Structure formats: C-alpha cells, structure tokens
A protein has these predicted regions:
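Conserved cytosolic headpiece of P-type ATPases
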Residues: 1-363
C-alpha cells in the first residue's frame, strides 16, 4: 500500500514562525514584512489584557505576528492608513496573491507568493533604491531562496509596483502581477509533528510506502522528508512542472522512485494516484481543498482533513481525519488490519469446527 500525504498540517504542525528575512543589501526587512502583512487576510484582535490574537491561515498569521512583535507594525492601524481597495486572491495555479492600496496619491500593488514564480514577474529589485533586476541580482535571490529552503523553511517572496489608477473591469494576473519590484524573501519554520517519524517507521515495517505531496519548494520538502525518514538514499523528488512534461505511461513506470512531489497542483494528485494504482498498489490520499475532490474520489482511500478540509473534500472522501495528523492514518491502518485478521480467524474457526455438519448438509 501507499499513503500519499500532504506536508503542511499533516506531517508538520502547521504552526509557522518567521525566522529569517532576506533582502538585497539586508536593508529592507521592514518593507518585506509590510507587504506580507498588508497582502494578507489574517484577522488581528486583542484580548482584555492587551495580548494579540490572530485568526487565519498559519502562513499569513506568521507575517502579522512577526511584523507586530519585531517591528511594531499593527495590521489594523496599517489598514486604516492604506485600506485594501481590491485584490487578486491566492490560488494554487498562480501561487501568488495581490492587493491594491492607496499610497501618496497613487496606488501600490502588493504581491506575495512563491519566490521562483514571483521573481520571474519582476523587472527590478529594491537595493539602494529601485535597481534593474540583472541576472547577477536574480541569482542572489535564487541562492538565498535555496539556502532557506535547504534549512526546511517555507519561503515566500514579497514584491510591489506602483500604478496611477486601479484597472477598470475584471482584474487579471497578466495586468497586475508583472513588471514588479522584488523586495525580499521571508523564511518560516513549520516543525514536523513529533509523532510522525515513529509513524513513518511503522509504515515501512508494515510494508506501506509513505509519499510526501506539497505545494512548497522542492528543497524545503526534501529537507523535511529527510528529517522524517520519508526521503531515503536512492529516492528522488520531482516538481509539478516536471510532471507536466512527463507522459502518464512514463510516470507509471517511474512512480516508485519518487518519495517527494513538490510545487504540485491538485490535478497532479490524480495522476499520482492512478500511476500507483497501475502498479497494483492500494492508495490512500489526503486532501483538504475543493480541487482535491477528484483525487480523493479516485484514491482507494480518500482522507479529508477534519480541521482544514472543505465540505466538498469531506463529501468526496471515504474517511475524515479529525485531527489532520498523519500518525492517525497509520493507527487506523493498524486497527483495520487487526479487525481483518480477527474476521479471518473467526471464519477459519467456524469452518474447522463445523466442517462435519457442512458435509452432512450437502450429502
């Protein structure tokens, strides 16, 4: 059997903390956190004793918490100064999110998202003022991104551009998210769940292959997979972009080599499930989004997330993981195998005890 598991929240704790901010020349930490805080759907409130409380996506709350604690930037006050006029919400295809805010009589588009995707849409970088993004500077950003990812950090890039007026009609990514100025990289740690490494060892002991599937950078995914012993010597990692160029027949032949799938979209999950099934394996697949529903349906065991899962994902799944924890799937397999074994034993016992009566009945 094979368990294809999401990384964030299932293999990790989904409690992100900003631990590193990189910018060109190291002088634009505050600007990077400002963009990450404004281009953000987190709700910031305060308890009676004045302590801050955040509600929202853990990646986004990490930005708001870091900006508040380390730089004194309160999201609520910032939004009064620069209210959000409109937005292009995040989606897993673009891997970007953009918001537009008034600034100095013009408007500023603030963008955050996957660094490799974001960098490709930038034409300048914030250094000593705005500088053209040369190949040398782009390489600096790529190297900093790789260095953070190798430390198992989830990395997001921040960029902006100024426009004279908000575009009329429907906002498009081509119009808003191009010709940007790159500001910096923000690295966050999302520690693995304590119990997962033991659960992975139990998987291997039971003849089950754990596979990690994530939207994160390949180096980040591999670093965490190695820590959990999912990625072993001889294993390979592949990105969604590489999968796009790989025919399904080839994936079916090569699927056993891959322990980590990075920058993967929900459509890729379906292909991975079918490839494993072609190899004669029983496949369990986890998912939480609306787009995960087809893969959950196709998998032999679709596991929807009980905490972060959408109603659509839960409806398409065979089982709901109430605590979103990988170790719980392994315990469920253990319990299921125990029940199956007990049923077999009961049937053997009844047949062996009553064989005389059965023969008499048929004679």
């Amino acid at each position: 059997g094979v368990i294809c598991s999401d990384k964030t929240g299932t293999l990790t704790q989904n409690r992100l903390t900003v631990v590193d901010v990189w910018s060109c020349g190291g002088a634009h930490r505050k600007e990077a956190l400002l963009i990450g805080t404004m281009c953000n759907d987190t709700v910031l409130t305060y308890d009676g004793d004045g302590s801050p409380r955040t509600a929202g996506d853990p990646t986004e709350t990490a930005f708001v918490t870091a900006a508040l604690k380390e730089d004194g930037m309160d999201k609520n006050l910032l939004e009064k100064e620069m209210p959000r006029m409109t937005e292009l919400p995040f989606d897993s295809e673009r891997k970007l999110m953009s918001t537009i805010h008034p600034l100095n009589g013009k408007y500023r588009v603030m963008v955050k998202g996957a660094p490799d995707v974001l960098l490709a849409r930038c034409t300048s970088i914030l250094d000593d003022g705005v500088t053209a993004l040369t190949p040398v500077l782009a390489k600096q950003v790529e190297d900093a991104n790789a260095a953070m990812a190798e430390k198992a950090l989830r990395v997001l890039g921040c960029a902006y551009k100024d426009i004279d007026a908000i575009p009329q009609g429907e906002l498009t990514s081509e119009e808003l998210e191009n010709g940007l100025t790159f500001v910096g990289l923000v690295g966050m740690i999302d520690p693995p769940r304590m119990e997962v490494k033991q659960a992975v060892a139990e998987c291997y002991g039971a003849g089950i292959r754990p596979v990690m599937i994530t939207g994160d950078h390949k180096l980040t995914a591999v670093a965490i997979a190695k820590e959990l012993d999912i990625f072993r010597p001889g294993d390979l990692a592949i990105t969604g972009e590489d999968l796009d160029f790989m025919p399904q027949e080839m994936l079916e032949q090569e699927v056993e080599k891959f322990a980590v799938y990075a920058r993967v979209s929900p459509e890729h999950k379906m292909r991975i499930v079918k490839a494993w099934q072609k190899r004669g394996q029983v496949v369990a697949m986890t998912g939480d989004g609306v787009n995960d529903a087809p893969a959950l349906k196709v998998a032999d065991i679709g596991c929807a997330m009980g905490i972060t899962g959408t109603d659509v994902a839960k409806g398409a799944a065979d089982m709901i993981l109430t605590d979103d924890n990988f170790a719980t799937i392994v315990h469920a397999v253990e319990q299921g195998r125990g029940i199956y074994s007990n049923i077999k034993k009961a049937i053997h016992y009844l047949l062996s005890c009553n064989i005389g009566e059965i023969i008499t009945l048929f004679l």
